Amino acid sequence: MTPNRASNQAGYSLVEVMVVLAVIALLAGAAALMLPSGTPAAQRAADRLSLDLMRAERAAITSGDFIGLTVTGEGYAFSRFDGETWQASEPGGLRAVRLGDEVRLLIEAEGAPAYWFDPTGVNGEARFVLDDGEHRVTVAFVNGDVRISGEGA
């Protein structure tokens, strides 16, 4: 009796199974990247702002210049005081930040810049509120420390 050739070739090889598993893993990874992060937009913006506040304070101290933060229609930007006027720049690598359409930055200050960092490191207190319509997060800059509080914090 001769063995049936068709039965020897039935099923899938290990290589074929591994390729299918790799494709499934890639698709699952791509789908996971498309899901929302779960962190409210106001919280993400507050985290970014708190880091930028600390970097701006450090840039003012190391450069010996006053560094200003100006609230723009889209977010916020930094500038440097040249002794007479505020000049738009990227002091210490601080770039303008666009918060997106869903987040508003509120600060109780008038004029431009809304807040500035003293090169001596002695800075006043400031409170920034970020609101995305559902969550409201406050970033407080007090004595060189940054504190985040509010919904989603």
What do these predicted ranges mean?
Residues 1-7, 26, 30-50, 54, ...:
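N-terminal helix-rich module
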